[in-house]
Amino acid sequence: MSSQLADPTYQGDLGNGLIRRWSTAADQPKIGQCLATVFRPNADAPLNVRSIDEVRILMSGAHPFMGPGDFAIVEDTNLPERPVVACTCCWSHTWSYAGIPFGVGQPELVATLPEYRNRGLVRALFEMAHARSAAKGEMMQVITGIPYFYRQFGYEYAIDLEGHRTVAAADAPARKEDEPEPYSLRLATVADIPHLQALYNQERDKSLLWHELDDGYWRAHITSWDDPAIQGKDVTQIGMIGPLRMIVDKDGAVCGYIWLATKRWGSALRVFALQLYPHVNWQQAMPSLLRACRAHGEQTPGIRAESKPFSEISFGLGRSHPAYTVLGEKLAPRGEPPYAWYVRVADVPGFVRHIAPVLEDRLAASIATGHTGELAIDLYRGGLRLQFEQGKLAAAEPWRQPDYGDDPPAGCPPLVFLQLLLGYRSLAELRATFPDVYAEPEAALLLDILFPKQMSMMAWMSYT
């Protein structure tokens, strides 16, 4: 048994008969029971069987983001069945910043049984998750989650997440009777992986941050629907949200892909991804795709008996998308702005050093090309010192305000700085919002060059 938080054999005593440890395959039923109990509408509702199936998928050994030993759990040893009373799982990804790859850890499925809440169990589990992520060399942790909660663990909202435009299903344009449908959908196969990679990565250069997906991800996404464990089951009871579909023309040539849900959480059919090759005309394709989505939605069941009837198509494609432009205000008058990813970067100087080539390229392309000088940024609980020599980053290191002397030329709350670092907000936007963000003119010029506002398109990519 190890005392190291990241070690698979670690076990820690939390008092009152509670221990924290890493999962094994044998824990799957108890983890599923915990999540199925927590993720339901109310205490009297049936267990959420989709959560049980999701745990089966995640712990199968075939999931691209994690394995059976990647749940951090708390179990109650006072009870004979030693139930799992709190848990989170730890996914691992490769993202990139302007093309520079780095590791990312993602805690997900964070849950505590109601009777065990307010005991610090999630904090204890996040200590384990952060330790394991650090042991893997991951420079960043991210999470999608409920408002505010994860700020207490060092996370800040710093990347767009989703964003929706909604079309009334009845408004899908009718096809002329004498014209064949120009585009149709078919299920993706492993033979489509080169197309999926090419279509997905079309947007890579437009996004500051990017989720680097290998062929194994697409293969798992596709073949998971062939699993004997789900054959013949009600789709509302399984943990996966929907298979990938290829968009093909009248001749069967691949023109794009779309990711549609196989169940509804309300009246809307959700569209998680949509991409077309550059040679395909979006204006010509969208009417056909709307009709295909409407037909699919009419066959898509709600997850509850009381679910509202299908009436809408919700395109969750981010802040902007070619489909939104084509739909316009007439077809998609109602939208929802993006939520955001929570982001944690424990070693900001280390991350800055990692992306130094990008910063140097930005300097070289600016009016400050060949810059030599120091920039100290007060982060209030510490700071960051950047030293440039002839346009090259010579140092990025922790800095602390001395007891006496002038204030540094720039200051920013420590977590808010992540919004600047990751291009989520400009310096001017942060200064207009936070009174404790400041920069003297020369420092402001340099910060604007080094950390410009830039869009990141980071979609939810798990198929569960």
Region annotations inferred by a language model:
Residues A43, E54-A72, C87-C89, G99, ...:
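N-terminal, Lys/Arg-enriched amphipathic/low-complexity engagement segments
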Residues A135-M139, T144-H164, G316-P337:
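Conserved active-site alpha-helix within GNAT-family acetyltransferase domains
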Residues M1-P29, Q33-P46, D53-R56, E75, ...:
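Intrinsically disordered, low-complexity, positively biased terminal segments
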Residues S133, Q141, Y150, R245, ...:
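Conserved catalytic-core segments centered on acid/base and nucleophilic motifs
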